[in-house]
């Protein structure tokens, strides 16, 4: 059981009614709270919850419809996403309690201050390096408009200006990160066919690929619902069309790909995790056609070349800058 869930269950009498659990971990909490409904924006956690508690978990950038007696937000990493989620939940709970739970090292005490705009916040419990906060929603806000929270910016790229739409919680929100900037300079001479942007974020790499290779079929994949929505908006802003899907890791990707392009993710919530990128390398060959190519950017200190050569083929370093390297390998 996740320690945040354990803290909630210490106060289980507060959550006996119709409770919405937002951003909950994929543990047994839903099984302990019979009246609870889950809202997740992480495709992997949603899939696990749906297998165990079918019909009780909603996925997306907006909460499920219905009336709730209370809601609990499991603190996400992004402060801007936290603000959007708290406002979204508080708008549905006038005169009712809203709870916030999170790890101390994840910034729960700072985030709890955001509850003050809805009423008087108080700390209910502290255990397992986590805290549980409550606020009675006396000043319910209007439901926030996700469009108004999006950041729009233009990148001047070799193929021309690219309009980017970035939503709260998406990696490198509102800016181009150094790794992707380097990879954008090394997208030439990709094989024709079906291309995958793995861990698509705001869709910058995917949109660039579609402009450069308009005859290729493009798939963008991310585990996060806000990233999926951002990519769709970025494509639309540039008059481009592609398939954008939510899925947990490379196993959710189609087969017979001509190329996989990625600035692979390295966070799971507030924690650093290289599981998704390592699994991508280990299983890329299963998703590539013969002579298909993988091209990724990664921190230079990560020992990916031996892993790439073990599972895919000869690893070439195409470029190095700002602490990042571009690796290329072709399936034999």
From Swiss-Prot:
Locations listed in the record: Cytoplasm
GO molecular function, one term: nucleic acid binding
Catalytic class of the enzyme: transferase
One Pfam family here: MTS_N
Highest taxon above the source species: Bacteria
SUPFAM superfamilies: S-adenosyl-L-methionine-dependent methyltransferases
InterPro entries the UniProt entry points to: DNA_methylase_N6_adenine_CS (IPR002052), Mtase_sm_N (IPR013675), rRNA_ssu_MeTfrase_C (IPR023543), RsmC/RlmG (IPR046977), SAM-dependent_MTases_sf (IPR029063), Small_mtfrase_dom (IPR007848)
Reactions listed under catalytic activity: guanosine(1207) in 16S rRNA + S-adenosyl-L-methionine = N(2)-methylguanosine(1207) in 16S rRNA + S-adenosyl-L-homocysteine + H(+)
One GO cellular component term: cytoplasm
Function: Specifically methylates the guanine in position 1207 of 16S rRNA in the 30S particle.
PANTHER family (alphabetical): RIBOSOMAL RNA SMALL SUBUNIT METHYLTRANSFERASE C (PTHR47816:SF4)
Family under the similarity heading: Belongs to the methyltransferase superfamily. RsmC family.
Subunit relationships: Monomer.
Name this protein carries in UniProt: Ribosomal RNA small subunit methyltransferase C
Annotated organism of origin: Stutzerimonas stutzeri (strain A1501) (Pseudomonas stutzeri)
């Amino acid at each position: 059981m996740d320690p945040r869930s354990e803290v909630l269950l210490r106060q289980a009498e507060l959550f006996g009614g119709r409770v919405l659990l937002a951003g909950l971990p994929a543990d047994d909490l839903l099984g302990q709270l019979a009246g609870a409904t889950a809202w997740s924006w992480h495709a992997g956690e949603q899939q696990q919850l749906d297998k165990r508690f079918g019909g009780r978990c909603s996925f997306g950038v907006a909460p499920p419809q219905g009336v709730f007696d209370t809601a609990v937000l499991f603190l996400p990493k992004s402060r801007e996403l936290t603000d959007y989620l708290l406002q979204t939940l508080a708008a549905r709970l006038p005169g009712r309690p809203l709870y916030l739970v999170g790890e101390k090292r994840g910034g729960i005490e700072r985030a709890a201050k955001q509850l003050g705009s809805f009423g008087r916040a108080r700390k209910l419990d502290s255990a397992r390096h986590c805290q549980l906060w409550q606020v009675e929603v006396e000043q319910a806000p209007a439901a926030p408009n996700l469009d108004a929270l999006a950041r729009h910016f233009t990148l001047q790229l070799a193929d021309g200006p690219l309009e980017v739409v970035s939503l709260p919680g998406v990696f490198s929100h509102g800016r181009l990160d150094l790794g992707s900037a380097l990879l954008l300079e090394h997208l030439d001479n990709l094989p024709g066919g079906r291309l995958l942007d793995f861990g698509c974020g705001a869709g910058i790499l995917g949109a660039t690929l579609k402009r450069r290779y308009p005859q290729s079929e493009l798939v963008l994949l991310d585990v996060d619902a806000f990233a999926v929505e951002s990519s769709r908006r970025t494509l639309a802003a540039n008059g481009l069309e592609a398939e954008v899907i939510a899925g947990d890791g490379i196993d959710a990707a189609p087969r017979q790909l001509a190329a996989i392009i990625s600035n692979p993710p390295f966070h799971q919530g507030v924690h650093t995790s290289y599981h998704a990128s390592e699994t991508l390398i280990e299983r890329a060959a299963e998703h590539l056609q013969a002579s298909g190519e993988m091209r990724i950017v990664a921190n230079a200190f990560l020992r990916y070349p031996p892993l790439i050569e073990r599972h895919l083929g000869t690893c070439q370093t195409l470029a190095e800058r700002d602490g990042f390297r571009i690796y290329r390998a072709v399936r034999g």
